[in-house]
Amino acid sequence: MNFKEYVPLAMRTCKSLPTADHINHMCLGIVGEMGELVDQIKKAYVYGKAIDQVNIIEEVGDVAYYTAGLVQHFPALADWLDSDELKQSINYEKLEVARENITRTILLNAMSAANLAADLMMFADDDNLQDANAEQVAKALGTALFATAVLLEVDLSQACE
């Protein structure tokens, strides 16, 4: 399943809110779920627990759900997440190096996602939604989330089931 196919399925369960509230809800959801993802990594790093791959897939799926909610207002985001251009924009060599310090990298990606979500919330009112910068921020957020999924070896299509 690609992201475009996933969005309408995911949004069947999404509460209907005015545009600005909906975008804020999705951005806050992304930040919260990235926090839960970081918590899983923390448990492995600090307490030596094995990474629970099933839970990791669930958390990435939750992040994908909230990202799907942004697609309603930034349709280009779905195209971006399904594009070869996104996959080519990821520096896989850097990700391999980053994998050596996965805790730090996941934390940096989570912080990046949180900052981008906060930036996106500034565009939440209808007057600013058409701003080209809003679409760029949405794409950057999608890239941070995709890179995190790649780093954790989670196939987004698997997480979107």
Can you annotate each of these PLM segments?
Residues M1-E161:
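Flexible "arm" and connector segments at domain edges
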